[in-house]
A protein has these predicted regions:
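Hydrophobic transmembrane alpha-helices and their immediate junctions
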Residues: 46-86
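Short glycine/serine/threonine-biased micro-segments
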Residues: 7-11, 45-48, 85, 90, ...
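Generic hydrophobic alpha-helical scaffold/packing signal
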Residues: 16, 40, 44, 53, ...
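Short, flexible helix-adjacent loops and helix caps
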Residues: 7, 67-71, 95-98
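A generic structural signal for secondary-structure junctions
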Residues: 20-24, 70, 114
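Long extracytoplasmic/lumenal interhelical loops at the membrane interface
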Residues: 3-4, 8-46
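Transmembrane alpha-helices of multi-pass inner-membrane enzymes
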Residues: 80-93, 97-123
Length: 123
């Protein structure tokens, strides 16, 4: 899929529909709802530019959380955000966890909470 559609991907939620055309003839599953790998799923559905942007997002989030870990009075939240990124990346090699809205919401809260907690302009 990625080789045939490197720039745009096959489109959101199209992997299941097109999987049969690309699957290995010896694959156990004839139908697959997703590719069980976050980077592969993003590249297949949305293309390599989207994968690059996703990678940049994670790199910036990780870098900023690392800075928070050293400077924030809520270091434990920054550590939790970094752990969330590490856990998502590890699990994401074997499951498309970004396709699960509950997971995605918790992940985004975990990586943004350290920044919200350090705001001083709140009443």
């Amino acid at each position: 899929m990625i080789e045939d559609h490197p720039v745009t991907g096959v489109g959101p939620n199209m992997v299941q529909r097109l999987y049969a055309q690309y699957r290995d003839p010896e694959a156990v599953e004839k139908v697959n709802p997703h590719l069980h790998n976050v980077p592969m799923q993003i590249a297949a559905e949305r293309g390599l530019p989207a994968l690059a942007i996703w990678t940049l997002f994670l790199a910036v989030a990780g870098t900023d959380l690392w800075k928070k870990l050293k400077t924030s009075r809520h270091r434990f939240l920054a550590a939790g955000g970094l752990a969330a990124i590490a856990g998502m990346l590890a699990a994401g090699l074997f499951e498309y966890n970004f396709g699960d809205s509950e997971f995605l919401m918790l992940f985004l809260v975990m990586i943004t909470l350290p920044f919200a907690a350090d705001r001083t302009d709140l009443p």
